[in-house]
Design a protein with these regions (language model features):
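Short glycine-rich, polar/acidic loop-and-turn segments at beta strand-coil junctions
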Residues: 35, 46, 63-65, 72-74
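Short arginine-rich
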Residues: 19-22, 47-57
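C-terminal structural segments of small proteins and small subunits
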Residues: 67-92
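Mid-chain, well-packed structural core segment of small domains
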Residues: 52-61, 67-71
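Short amphipathic alpha-helices in soluble, non-transmembrane regions
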Residues: 42-46, 83-86
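N-terminal first-folded block
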Residues: 1-36
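Flexible nucleotide-interacting loop at or near the entrance of a catalytic core
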Residues: 39
């Protein structure tokens, strides 16, 4: 099982993904696009990356906005995998 991050490690890693917000046992970010198709294209790119890592975000799509929530459910909170995926997702936007 993947190891949970200590609070001080979470704070340090948040500095590397400044657009992500800490929410209890997860991090989240909302991305805004010009329209629905662009949002869906982004979700498809995220899905490919998530599959390659076998680490899947919670995704909420609202017309031109996509909210991603990252947490390692099997560990019950944040792990390095969440921050690795956040970094990769930021490059896809």
């Amino acid at each position: 099982m993947t190891q949970l991050l200590r609070p001080e490690a979470v704070e340090n890693l948040l500095g590397e993904v400044p657009n992500w917000k800490l929410r209890e046992n997860s991090i989240e970010r909302t991305f805004k696009f010009s329209g629905f198709q662009e949002a869906i294209d982004f979700v498809n790119r995220v899905a490919q990356e998530a599959e390659s890592m076998n680490h899947h975000p919670d995704i909420d799509i609202r017309w031109n906005k996509v909210k991603l929530v990252l947490s390692t459910h099997s560990a019950g909170g944040l792990t390095n995998n969440d921050f690795m995926l956040a970094t990769k997702v930021d490059k896809l936007a």
